[in-house]
Amino acid sequence: MIPANTFPALGNSFFPQETLLMGAGPVPQPPSVKQANTHIASHLGQRMNEVVEQLKAMARYAFQTTTPWVFGLSGPGSAAAEMAIGNLVHRRSRVLAISSGHFGLRMCEMARRHQAKVVLFEFDGREAFPLDRLRALLEQQVFDVVTLVHGETSSTTLNPDLPKIAALCKKQRALVVVDTVCTLGTTEVLMDNWQLDVVFCGGQKGLSSIPGVSLIAFSNEAWERVVQRTFTPTQWCYDALLAKGFWHHHRYHYTAPVNGIFALHEALRLLNEETLPLRIQRHRQSSQGVQKVLLQFGLTLAAPLPTRLDAVVGFQLPVWLSSVALIDHLLSQHQVEISASFGSPLLRIGQMGEQCRAANVLRLVTALGESLDALGHPVDLVGALKTVSAQYGHRELLQYD
């Protein structure tokens, strides 16, 4: 018999002090979301039915859509991308994959694995989107599905021309599939107004919920395409017609992630309570404070306005300063974590959900300033703290412990 293992419990010795997550996700969770995640119940029955219906209503507000076709699913935002593509794309599909980084390429790869005829349209996300180049391509070729990312976290760039891109694609009745994993709840996303057909996100970023439970919404046009499809999706768990059984008829599909659904419900409740305009304003205000501090510290921001992503702020260090050393110093000396970026020289600071609270930003700035100074890059930490404090109102600063 193979012997049993005797690992210790993951208690205080493994988590001596909770790390402040200020990277590209996951992000800190509000206490009420943490509490909701401790509850367990049957995934079927009246109580879960009520939770699911409320969750869908609150998700419609987050997506800014009236479509009935809203679903949750087990898995990260990439699983939601799989669900979107797997229900709309097959061997004969013509797919245009618009990409400015890692996650745009990921959807391109997903479509290729479904043996679609894929055209990759790459552009530099730091620059204005080449609408004329897209217009010329759409005049030459017809596509069934267009995939793109609203906020590309790998390059920390925003695509502010998303509404114009969608309008061009809709002229030839292509379905527009959009990754809003980091922008939902942090940046304006208007699914119906922008004519988006499928929009998805993970729970662990702008919504400040737990990883592993995601959201997806299909427009009526996209759902009609799902219903009329002539193929069977290769992934059983992410078949939208099967998922409809649980999310719309309260029938068994697979054992739903009950704790995660409760956590996501609470995260969406908090968003609805705060309202989108106030939440987006809070994110913009906090992110701008972080951006100002990075510039005061003599660091280089990765993207210019208006393509700079507020939700995940990218920056570069002087060439002589090791990004690995900075990440390690922040974590070992201050229990603050920021992110690298897929092997590029970029470092990333998250400004999503609970990351955009005065207490968390002030702790981040203090840790970053002290770490830079310790690594031989002196900074004006007092001035930086004054700068970021000016971004917050007096009431929120009083909450800083």
Where are the regions a protein language model picked out?
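A glycine-/small-polar-enriched, mobile loop at the entrance of the PLP active site in fold-type I
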Residues: 18-74, 78
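Conserved PLP-binding catalytic core of the aspartate aminotransferase-like
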Residues: 300-330
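Conserved active-site segment immediately N-terminal to the catalytic lysine
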Residues: 192-204
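PLP-dependent enzyme catalytic core of the Aspartate aminotransferase-like
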Residues: 344-401
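Active-site C-terminal subdomain of aminotransferase-like
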Residues: 28, 204-292, 398-401
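Active-site phosphate-binding strand-loop segment of PLP-dependent enzymes
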Residues: 129-185, 198
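N-terminal glycine-rich, Lys/His-bearing helix-loop that initiates the first secondary-structure elements
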Residues: 1-38, 395-401
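Conserved beta-loop-alpha segment that forms the PLP phosphate-binding cup at the N-terminus of a helix
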Residues: 68-96, 100-108
